[in-house]
UniProtKB/Swiss-Prot annotation:
Binding-site list for [4Fe-4S] cluster: 121, 127, 130, 208
UniProt gene name: rlmD
Organism ancestry: Bacteria, Pseudomonadati, Pseudomonadota, Gammaproteobacteria, Alteromonadales
EC number: 2.1.1.190
Role, per record: Catalyzes the formation of 5-methyl-uridine at position 1939 (m5U1939) in 23S rRNA.
EC top class named in words: transferase
Natural source organism: Alteromonas mediterranea (strain DSM 17117 / CIP 110805 / LMG 28347 / Deep ecotype)
Name this protein carries in UniProt: 23S rRNA (uracil(1939)-C(5))-methyltransferase RlmD
Binding site for S-adenosyl-L-methionine: 313, 342, 347, 363, 390, 411
Keyword Iron-sulfur found: yes
PANTHER family per UniProt: 23S RRNA (URACIL(1939)-C(5))-METHYLTRANSFERASE RLMD, RNA M5U METHYLTRANSFERASE
Length: 482
């Protein structure tokens, strides 16, 4: 771990041989070529960095990364610098500033970090899908994990021994669902891929190394199948989804597509073992041909069967590790009453129920509740009560929790679970496991639980989205001993 945090040796030496100087110059050139193409938010406030502290060289030195992977320089003013790595001295341009906190972008680098590496994707500099391919993946996780640990210790006053080792999966091919943007204004020259960062422009792709196969290898042939058809203009976006049994191409269209286009796409898909699903403007789904439903296996023989627009955890391996960790932390016992809030299709619900607990699954999307219930019945799981509820309605939430539960699992969206947490400190289940995709709202909600009589016993990150700013985390709360 220690060598992940060391600074570039080239910066630490005052004397270098001619060959070392040449190597360092080449390294700087490569690094500056990288940052020249990095994607940054534009701002009317952008201006050249020029403070009394560094007016002579217009540069700052990066000490660490924050949990999102931005370079951090601490001092009287704190700088968060996109595209910069620990140990690098960077010329920067300010994007925005507020009091003594500055957001900036890297203009050039004097002596690249040993952690800097060439992106493995040829369109990384343009594409908005990934943000962190310029750093060694293990080092990025180590820095970000440590930054999040420090943030939680500072904001929540958690004790030693709470922070757990990260849950890690495959890199880079990990993503089993993606939404592709399309530019078909010229049907003879269609662009299909992801959007540029902070732009509506589409980066044209043939493959994507982040996606699992056959999703990655389907992009180029899919674009070729669409080209030449005028009704391709009516396609809003295309989703690619990989189950464990099949994969799907889901085409969202605003007006009817011509039969010839559908037939050509279906022929392309069949050749690659894919199913085609059409989604009209009203959200109705129609399979082309004899498309099979998707099956995604999880743990303990459980599985979910998502529809095209259902939320799923996009990293299969990390998702299974999260479920297993939740089972260990919750320790569900036969006949215990356990509530699974924001339950979706039953990703956590079904494995918990398999342990014999009496589970109430509460979800805000009615269609997902119906599919989850049907899916559970097909697997012979009957000890779950499936409820559709407005999860932001205080009265409904409190009424549901008044039934009394031994343990609770939360897996909310990025908005968090503030209403539910306020109700939980009144209902007082003995154990709460919180799964979060937004550390900021998690910290807010955790304060409610801690102030309401709980202590954070365990917590840690799950690397659900390698090479991006996003970070998943999990925490175990238990009632504080009086």
């Amino acid at each position: 771990m220690a060598n992940l945090f060391k600074q570039s040796r080239a910066k630490q030496k005052n004397k270098t041989t001619p060959s070392q100087t040449q190597t360092s110059t080449k390294g700087s050139a490569r690094a500056n070529a990288q940052v020249a193409g990095l994607r940054f938010k534009k701002s009317k406030q952008s201006k050249e960095h020029n403070t009394a502290q560094d007016a002579n060289n217009n540069a700052i030195t990066i000490q660490e990364l924050d949990w999102m992977g931005q370079g951090v320089a601490r001092g009287a003013t704190m700088y968060f610098v996109e595209g910069a790595l620990p140990g690098e001295t960077c010329d920067i341009e300010v994007v925005s500033s507020k009091k003594k906190v500055v957001s900036a972008k890297t203009i050039s680098i004097q002596g690249p970090s040993e952690l800097r590496q060439p992106p493995f994707c040829p369109v990384f500099e343009a594409c908005g899908g990934c943000q962190l391919q310029h750093i060694d993946a293990d080092a990025a996780l180590a820095y970000r994990d440590n930054a999040l640990k420090i943030m939680m210790e500072r904001q929540l006053s958690i004790g030693s021994g709470v922070w757990q080792a990260p849950l890690v999966g495959p890199r880079p091919q990990y993503r089993r669902k993606a939404r592709l943007a399309i530019d078909a204004r010229n049907p003879d020259n269609i662009k299909l891929g992801f959007r540029e960062a902070n732009s509506n422009k589409v980066v044209n792709l043939d493959t994507c190394p982040i996606l699992v196969n056959p999703l990655s290898t389907a992009i180029g042939p899919l674009r070729n199948a669409l080209e030449g058809y005028d009704s391709a203009r009516h396609i809003g976006h295309i989703s690619l989804i990989a189950g464990d049994n099949r994969a799907q191409v889901v085409i969202k269209h605003t007006k009817a597509l011509e039969d010839a286009l559908i037939e050509t796409v279906d022929a392309f898909a069949k050749a690659l073992g894919l199913d085609v699903v059409l989604e009209n403007k009203q959200g109705r789904l129609r399979s082309v041909g004899e498309a099979q439903g998707l099956i995604m296996h999880t743990v303990d023989g459980c599985s979910i069967s998502p529809s095209a627009n259902d939320f799923i955890q996009i990293n299969k391996v990390v998702n299974e590790k999260m479920i297993n960790q939740a089972l260990v932390w919750l320790d569900p016992r036969p006949n215990e009453r356990i509530a699974d809030w924001f339950s979706g299709l039953g990703n956590f619900t079904l494995p918990i129920a398999k342990k014999g607990a009496l589970v109430q699954a509460i979800e805000g999307v009615a269609e997902m509740v119906l599919r989850a219930k049907d899916n559970a019945q097909q697997q012979g799981i009957e000890n779950v009560e499936w409820l559709h509820l407005d999860l932001a309605n205080k009265a409904n939430v409190e009424a549901s929790l008044q039934q009394g539960f031994d343990k609770v699992l939360l897996d909310p969206s990025r908005e968090g679970a503030l209403t539910v947490c306020h109700a939980l400190v009144k209902a007082l289940p003995k154990t709460i496991v919180y799964v979060s995709c937004n550390p900021s709202t998690f910290s807010r909600d955790a304060k409610v639980l801690i102030n309401g009589g709980y202590e954070m016993e365990k917590a840690g990150v799950a690397e659900m989205f390698p090479f991006t700013h996003h970070m998943e985390m999990m925490a175990l709360f238990t009632q504080r001993q009086q």
